[in-house]
A protein has these predicted regions:
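Glycine-rich P-loop/Walker A and Walker A-like loops and their local beta1-loop-alpha1 context
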Residues: 1-53, 58-62
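Conserved P-loop NTPase "ATPase switch" module shared by AAA+ and STAND
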Residues: 135-152
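Long, charge-dense
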Residues: 62-119
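Glycine-rich, aromatic-bearing surface loops/beta-hairpins
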Residues: 147-203
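Residue-level preference for the first positions of well-ordered beta-strands
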Residues: 27-31, 138-140, 169-171
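Short acidic, S/G/P-rich loop/turn micro-motifs used as interaction or catalytic elements
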Residues: 37-41, 68, 112-119, 147-151, ...
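A short, acidic, amphipathic alpha-helical segment used as a generic capping/interface helix at domain edges
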Residues: 14, 118-134
Length: 203
């Protein structure tokens, strides 16, 4: 955990430096990059980090991608959710037929991905949170559970679409690896994604 704590402390130094020396075009977007195998360690450590930030005078807010994804699903029409359930059941009943199983899950995941991206449903939830925090001094937003976006979408596209909306320091806890100054590999196996204008620490 010491390496994660070291990375988090370094990231917070960047956050403070950004607040002091940031210029008009700078958006306070930060990524703590960590090995996907440490997802559970991050989840256990997050409350302690949040408490530490509060002790330092920050107004801490947490946005869970997992909860946001669940909310989008819960808001879908009943008939759509029933269709997904039928697809899931069919996949489980045919688990011996690997090809059929893969096809069923592929259809289900495609439907879920469309639900998340249609009218930017998931992105709008994050944007609403960012808007709510705008103008609130000492606020900081911790975005957790980013692994919940797999296999539907990647956070890089969402960050790009929300450029200009980040008015308070926002920290994304990103399971993956760095492959360059601005390139990341989500969960360590997705293709490299360079659509980032944020500050990266760790990885």
């Amino acid at each position: 955990m010491s390496s994660l704590n070291t990375d988090f402390n370094e990231l917070m130094e960047r956050v403070r430096a950004g607040r002091e020396f940031g210029h008009a075009s700078f958006e306070p977007i930060f990524y703590l990059i960590f090995d996907p195998q440490k997802i559970l360690k991050i989840k256990r450590q997050l409350p302690a980090w949040a408490a530490k930030l509060r002790n330092e005078g920050w107004d801490v807010h947490v946005f869970s991608m997992a909860k946001a994804v669940q909310e989008v699903f819960d808001e879908m029409p009943v008939f759509v959710k029933k269709t997904w359930e039928k697809q899931d059941s069919a996949a489980l009943e045919n688990r011996d037929a690997a090809a059929n199983l893969g096809l069923q899950w592929q259809k289900t995941n495609k439907s879920l991905a469309e639900a998340l991206t249609k009218k930017n449903a998931l992105q709008n939830k994050l944007e609403a949170k960012l808007s709510d925090l705008e103008g609130k001094s000492n606020s900081i937003l911790l975005v957790s559970d980013i692994e919940a976006l797999h296999p539907y979408l990647r956070i890089g596209s969402m960050e790009s679409q929300l450029q200009g909306k980040f008015h308070v320091p926002t920290i994304f806890f990103y399971p993956g690896m760095r492959t360059g100054k601005t390139q990341l590999k989500f969960l360590g196996f997705y293709p490299e994604d360079g659509n980032y204008r944020s500050v990266h620490v760790g990885g």
